[in-house]
Amino acid sequence: MSLSLHLSGWPENSESRQRMLESSSSTNFVQHFVSREISNKERLLSLFRRLRNGLVLVLTPLFFGQMLNWEGPEWKCAYCVCIIAVYWMSEVMPLAVTAMLPVVLFPLVGVLDANTTAKEYMNDTNFLFIGGLIMAAAVEKCDLHERVALSVLRCVGSEPKWIMLGFMTVTALLSSFISNTATTAMMVPIGQSVVQQLISSFQHHPTNGERGRLGCKKMATGLVLSICFAANIGGTGTATGTPSNLVMLGQLSALFPKVDGSLNYVTWIFFAYPLMLLCLFVAWMTLVSFFLRDAPEKDEAVTEMLKTRYNELPRMTYAEKSVFVCFCILLSLWVFRNPGVVPGFGVFFKKGAYTDATSAMIVAFLLFVLPSERPDLATYIKKEDLKKRGCLMDWKTMQETFPWSVVLLLGGGFALAAGVKESGLSLLIGNSLSSIEHLPLWILQLLTMLIAMVITNICSNTVTASIFVPIVATLAQRAGHHPFTLMLPTTLASSFAFIFPVGTPPNAIVFGSGMVKVSDMAFVGGIISLELLVLTVLYMNSIAYLTLPLLEFPTWAIIANSTMQQ
């Protein structure tokens, strides 16, 4: 925040700001009047929000209530879906609380029984998510992610455009495996330090004029924007990178029970990582053209500062080494369970007995067992030393850092998908989309991605994927296209929330730094969104065919379709 105040000419020192405000009695009067007016506005806005929330909560079930009188279970399911979708998008209640409504609504209206609905909240995909988050929490606990970030950034040079590329690369890499929010929260302070160093060096050159000052301000904006954009893009790279990816995998199993293993952790990386890197490059080029045209020249002091920060890190601890080994073990288990090219170790188990969630939970269990300090038999004998020793992960850290609300949100999405399938609502939606099913595939991809991209900027990507993935799966099925051809781009588009600060937590963190205006984020974010939309459609109709079997309509989708039609 102090950096933005400095750039705008506002005194950084609180005493200086106070003297400026108290320079005259009229200033005090105006300040008091304005603060009173602002407080009145805040009270009115708060009252309006409470009234609006109450009206939405009460009127939404009444507005859609006529659906309950229509014949067929699909309309009862549609009634529940409409209520949940409105509550999610308006956020009249916490998202996780709304996600629990299927447990109440589905049994009451006769869509699913309570036991079947509740099972969806702790299915295999949700345990995969839980295991991945425990691994990420262990990485954050020992600060391994900071060491990785600084070790890469100190090698990128001192020119602003390469610094930006370094930040985006590190952020995308980390957000592929740990929380996008945690990655952004760690990278923004580092980015602010780098920008402060560049501006400090710029001020030592008195020949730089107003244009150079504005260039510094734009550079600061562009650099922190690149962090949140890279975090959103990086989450698409792996199946566990962001919750919306897991929503798609979970709903794939719910909508198509006989689906094969063609889309797993390994094949997702082969499919999505090249696209993620292409999207990252396009976003970087766009940010450079908008924010770094008048940036200061390269400054070796920045490189030295990053090297100094890296050298100030303590030696790699036993905990960091152990967590890194556990991380490698987890990746190896995910990769070699079913690599696709050759049979994996999964062939030694019955079908469904060992999944990616099994690997995640095995490593999560190890993190709670392995010590955080090097074992020493002599000290273990002493009881007082034994009490001081901890493990790589502990339950207190879990309670403080684990996003339980996201687990419920995922479960709510899976319950919705199960209800949509069992009630026949997916078939009803497919029939209603018959007018556009004959359009070329690339146009369908553009339309579905555009809708998902608009919605994800006003509500979470998990909610967006939960609502739209079943719809586009049915549309692809009716149009005779492989379901992946619409499900995958729609899922990816749900992560392309670059326009508003409320779109994703990384956006909100960057906006909270005080270095970004809403207009800056909205303008360049809108352009990048359209660029990535076109790039994804081109990728889906070219390179994607080399990574996934998308050319032929799968037998598991034909069987599901024929069953539904009967």
From Swiss-Prot:
It is found in: Membrane. The chain crosses the membrane at residues 55-75, 92-112, 123-139, 162-182, 219-239, 268-288, 329-349, 352-372, 400-420, 439-459, 496-516, 521-541. It is a multi-pass membrane protein. CDD domains: SLC13_permease. Keywords: Ion transport, Membrane, Sodium, Sodium transport, Symport, Transmembrane, Transmembrane helix, Transport. GO terms for biological process: citrate transport; determination of adult lifespan; succinate transport; transmembrane transport. Its main location: membrane. One of its GO terms (cellular component) is plasma membrane. The keyword Transport applies. GO terms for molecular function: citrate transmembrane transporter activity; high-affinity sodium:dicarboxylate symporter activity; succinate transmembrane transporter activity. High-affinity sodium-dicarboxylate cotransporter that accepts a range of tricarboxylic acid-cycle intermediates with 4-5 carbon atoms. There is no interaction with monocarboxylates. Plays a role in the regulation of life span. This is Sodium-dependent high-affinity dicarboxylate transporter 3. It comes from Caenorhabditis elegans. The gene is nac-3.
